[in-house]
């Protein structure tokens, strides 16, 4: 993401949560608008049980005499990612708030973004940054175990999207094949047109 674009759509699948958040925070401070899709497929290093215990300890942090005053603990993967990015921004200043407004994080790949080019961040990919054999877990599983109710719905919508996407890709390949064969036949057609065919 060296050059500035209007909007960058990042596919979060297979990325490490903290590493991706740091890259996104840096881009936001530079004025770049960033959309992060498939937040439920983000990875966290360390085995699942350890991460769940850490998250449950975080959930216990509250105001003793009136918990509705805060702190607020979001369970959705997109909100967990936004909170991670917020911690890397000066969010109490006008500059930090403006940067945070340029971030959009969603579960799955909803309609505006399923037709757009998605990118990955090599510096944050688990297969490149985590040692082979190390334990890791997904944010989606963690969220669903601490109170996020929409894991099944997002999975169902993703299956539908993948079927549509595969059909579109096959149609695109067929169209490219036709264009290629037409280009190959063009010299022959020119020769035939000289003789009135």
UniProtKB/Swiss-Prot annotation:
Biological processes per GO annotation: cytoplasmic translation; negative regulation of translation
The keyword Cytoplasm belongs to this UniProt entry's keyword annotation: yes
Subcellular location as annotated: Cytoplasm
GO cellular component, one term: cytosol
Family annotation (InterPro entries): Ribosomal_uL13, Ribosomal_uL13_CS, Ribosomal_uL13_euk/arc, Ribosomal_uL13_sf
Keyword Endoplasmic reticulum part of the UniProt annotation: no
Positions carrying Phosphoserine: 193
Keyword terms: Cytoplasm, Phosphoprotein, Ribonucleoprotein, Ribosomal protein
Entry's Gene Ontology molecular function annotations: mRNA binding; structural constituent of ribosome
Gene3D superfamilies linked to this entry: 6.10.250.3250, Ribosomal protein L13
Subunit structure: Component of the large ribosomal subunit (LSU). Mature yeast ribosomes consist of a small (40S) and a large (60S) subunit. The 40S small subunit contains 1 molecule of ribosomal RNA (18S rRNA) and at least 33 different proteins. The large 60S subunit contains 3 rRNA molecules (25S, 5.8S and 5S rRNA) and at least 46 different proteins.
PANTHER family: LARGE RIBOSOMAL SUBUNIT PROTEIN UL13, RIBOSOMAL PROTEIN L13
Protein family per UniProt: Belongs to the universal ribosomal protein uL13 family.
Role noted for this protein: Component of the ribosome, a large ribonucleoprotein complex responsible for the synthesis of proteins in the cell. The small ribosomal subunit (SSU) binds messenger RNAs (mRNAs) and translates the encoded message by selecting cognate aminoacyl-transfer RNA (tRNA) molecules. The large subunit (LSU) contains the ribosomal catalytic site termed the peptidyl transferase center (PTC), which catalyzes the formation of peptide bonds, thereby polymerizing the amino acids delivered by tRNAs into a polypeptide chain.
Protein name: Large ribosomal subunit protein uL13B
């Amino acid at each position: 993401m060296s050059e500035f674009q209007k909007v960058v759509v990042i596919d979060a699948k297979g990325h490490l949560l903290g590493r991706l958040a740091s890259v996104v925070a840096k881009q936001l401070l530079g004025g770049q608008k960033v959309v992060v899709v498939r937040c439920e497929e983000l990875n966290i290093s360390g085995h699942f049980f350890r991460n769940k215990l850490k998250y449950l300890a975080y959930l216990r942090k509250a105001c003793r005499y009136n918990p509705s005053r805060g702190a607020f603990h979001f369970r959705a993967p997109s909100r967990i990612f936004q909170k991670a990015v917020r911690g890397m921004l000066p969010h109490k200043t006008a500059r930090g708030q403006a940067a945070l407004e340029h971030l959009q994080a969603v579960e799955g790949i909803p309609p505006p973004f399923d037709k757009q080019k998605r990118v990955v961040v090599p510096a944050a990919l688990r297969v490149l940054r985590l040692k082979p054999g190390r334990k890791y877990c997904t944010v989606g599983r963690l969220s669903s175990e601490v109170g996020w109710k929409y894991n099944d719905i997002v999975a169902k919508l993703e299956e539908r999207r993948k079927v549509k996407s595969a059909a579109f890709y096959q149609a695109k390949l067929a169209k490219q094949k036709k264009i290629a064969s037409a280009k190959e036949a063009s010299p022959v057609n020119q020769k035939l047109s000289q003789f009135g065919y």
